[in-house]
Amino acid sequence: MLHLFLFSSAASTTTAVEDNSTTMPPSSRSAANQNSSSSLHLCKHSPSATLDLLILILVLFSGTFLLSSYFSYLIHSLSLLSSHFPSITISLSSLLPPLIIFFSSDHSTEDEDHHHPSGKIPPPASFFFAFAVFFAASIAFLDLCCGSRSRKCRNPKCKGMKKAMEFDLQLQTEECVKSGSVKEIDRLPWKGGSESNPDYECLRAELRKMAPVNGRAVLIFRSKCGCPIAKLEGWGPKRSRRHKKSPAKLAVKGCIDNR
């Protein structure tokens, strides 16, 4: 009886789930399918990210080991050289005191271990120091190669954007053109080499349609860092302003007419 009861309860739950899935609207079904697919899509890329992290750690430790060995050999060679030239010892001690302390202690313990096989393990101070130096150097190298400084151009006002917009459209009124705030845009070269390049006549015609009265529409082309490099412009229709007559002039004109 217990088995029959469990089987009937399981069947009822499955039928209830099926009924709920059939009664769901199509929009909710699509949203659920998108969520499940996105979760699966994210889970597919997680092993590769873990592998990349492990590779980065291995590269850092291997570089640290090589750098520590290089510094150990360098300091050991300089110590041997300074024994023959005492003047070099003073300059080295004033320039590189931490390195001499770390690596000379490391080599002294290594020499003691060679003479005394039962000696202690050398202190890992040089290893940690080399790891810190290599880590700082790698961060500085990445900042120089991939940071905002590497993306900056010769313009001193460059912001060093990563992926700036390729072009920018500006609608300038008559007051804006006369104000002198667009001098930087006026200095830009023309797209195509000259203002009357026939390859860009269609764009200039569209700019003329969008330009305000007595103003202009300027299409500014930008580089990846965001700095403007070229321009296209189209002027709007020219209309003269109607000057309003002052009340004094109207009064004088009325007096003349009455006479």
From Swiss-Prot:
TM spans (from-to): 55-75, 85-105, 127-147
Organism domain of life: Eukaryota
Lineage of source species: Eukaryota, Viridiplantae, Streptophyta, Embryophyta, Tracheophyta
Keyword Electron transport applies: no
Protein name, per record: Uncharacterized protein At5g19025
Cellular component, GO, one term: membrane
Membrane-topology annotation of the record: Multi-pass membrane protein
Subcellular localization, as worded in the UniProt entry: Membrane
UniProt keywords, alphabetically: Membrane, Transmembrane, Transmembrane helix
Primary location: membrane
The species this protein was found in: Arabidopsis thaliana (Mouse-ear cress)
InterPro entries, sorted: At5g19025-like
